[in-house]
Amino acid sequence: MTVLTAPGFSGAAPTLPSVAARLACRAGNAEQTAGLAPGYVQGNLAILPENLAASFHRFCQQNPKPCPIIGMSEVGDPKIPSLGLDLDIRTDLPRYRVWRDGEMVDEPTDIMAHWREDLVAFVIGCSFSFEEALMADELPIRHIEQGVRVPMYRTNIACAPAGPFAGPMVVSMRPLKPKDAIRAVQITSRFPSVHGAPVHLGLPQSIGIKDIAKPDYGDPVQIKDDEIPVFWACGVTPQAVIAAARVPFAITHSPGLMLVTDLKNKQLAVL
């Protein structure tokens, strides 16, 4: 595993891997977060003005598979102590996306210049958490093997609407042999707060994916002849919904570049 360092922290007392990961992001020394800080929960990010926060919270409650909330800030507060005492939502991800009227207008490495006192941050569970459990059972995770971002796709599966928020579910994909796919269903069912069991196996066209080799987000990965694509609900769904709703202003993470928290993956297992 690559060791990440942040200027000013060399020689310090031993630091949690999750804290080291955030410091590296803060210093611009992390290019992606898949496989980073093993054992620690990573999260998707959606930041909205206070006047839209209640509707978005309701949207997440009505769509728990793609949008399981694991943390939420107070209005105007960039800290979420339940996820990490030193955590700063404005600086601690490798890259962000800034949205205006449904269009992405910037992709900065921090959002200090975009932060406002009326913003509320939502952190949504990420499938990277259950990947640790899959790998512990010796199931292959292709995007980690290839050193790329997980492929993600917009689907024809409609989310339940809430206020201005409505749109398609986004899914992440991992290719597996059929017998391994069955085992993956069993393993990931234990993690409902990070998307849980798959929403679809095989036949990508039946959920509106026209070309499996051209993901809408992330990077394509190899699918071997004896494998099938396995699809999980994905926390990038809010980005598709924010774009569809054309909200005046929002901030999200850049797909595949997550917030590393101090929560342990094992804390999220229900069995």
Swiss-Prot record:
It comes from Rhodopseudomonas palustris (strain BisB18). NCBIfam families: PRK05463.1. Its EC number is 4.2.1.-. Pfam families: D-Glu_cyclase (PF07286). GO terms for molecular function: lyase activity. Keywords: Lyase. Belongs to the D-glutamate cyclase family. Signal peptide: none annotated. It is an enzyme of class 4 (lyase). This is Putative hydro-lyase RPC_1666. PANTHER family: D-GLUTAMATE CYCLASE, MITOCHONDRIAL (PTHR32022:SF10). It comes from the Bacteria.
